[in-house]
């Protein structure tokens, strides 16, 4: 397979890998601009500027399919990540929390490039973890078009052995349009990109 780094048509600016083997490094993100927005539960959250711009384009496209999407989570600092883990332990149990919430320092949400998406049904935002059977079929409608807006489904089905994170139909990651298109066409994960180029 062609080495992506040698393809001048593919922009790798946003192709930073954060996972359990590659912890978050704040220096990698100093070049990006961040903005404040409102989450689906009306909290003020932070997201990378270009990521949000392309999310709005994706949102407009989904409206044409009568699907309303919004952002529940974007950037989370380490304190917020630990708090989320503790909340999940209380609500869903430690085993589930250990699977679904990445350890502090290894979450893509530290970057502001990863978004957890919720859908609105009957004028109400629906929790993914509590209503998976309802939201998953709706969220799947956006998966085939994510790459057109520079996003990938970060944790697709049957990828847990590589990503170490179970299937999350709501978790999308901005990597830029050219790379997203390449990964989509070649059915690759972000980890595969690194294995090819390192």
Give the residues covered by each predicted segment.
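Extracytoplasmic cell-surface/polysaccharide-interacting catalytic and binding patches
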Residues: 1-198
């Amino acid at each position: 397979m062609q080495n992506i780094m040698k393809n001048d048509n593919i922009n790798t600016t946003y192709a930073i890998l954060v996972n359990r083997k590659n912890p978050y490094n704040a220096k990698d993100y100093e070049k990006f601009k961040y903005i404040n927005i409102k989450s689906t539960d009306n909290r003020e959250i932070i997201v990378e500027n270009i990521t949000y711009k392309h999310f709005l384009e994706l949102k407009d496209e989904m409206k044409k399919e009568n699907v309303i999407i919004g952002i529940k989570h974007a950037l989370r600092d380490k304190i917020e990540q630990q708090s989320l883990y503790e909340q999940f332990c209380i609500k869903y149990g430690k085993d589930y929390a250990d699977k679904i919430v990445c350890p502090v320092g290894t979450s893509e949400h530290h970057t502001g490039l990863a978004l957890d998406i919720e859908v609105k049904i009957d004028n109400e935002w629906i929790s993914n973890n509590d209503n998976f059977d309802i939201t998953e079929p709706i969220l799947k409608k956006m998966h085939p078009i994510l790459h057109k807006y520079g996003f990938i489904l970060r944790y697709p089905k049957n990828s847990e052995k590589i990503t170490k994170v179970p299937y999350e139909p709501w978790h999308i990651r901005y990597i830029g349009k050219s790379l997203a298109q390449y990964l989509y066409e070649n059915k690759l994960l972000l980890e595969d990109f690194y294995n090819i180029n390192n």
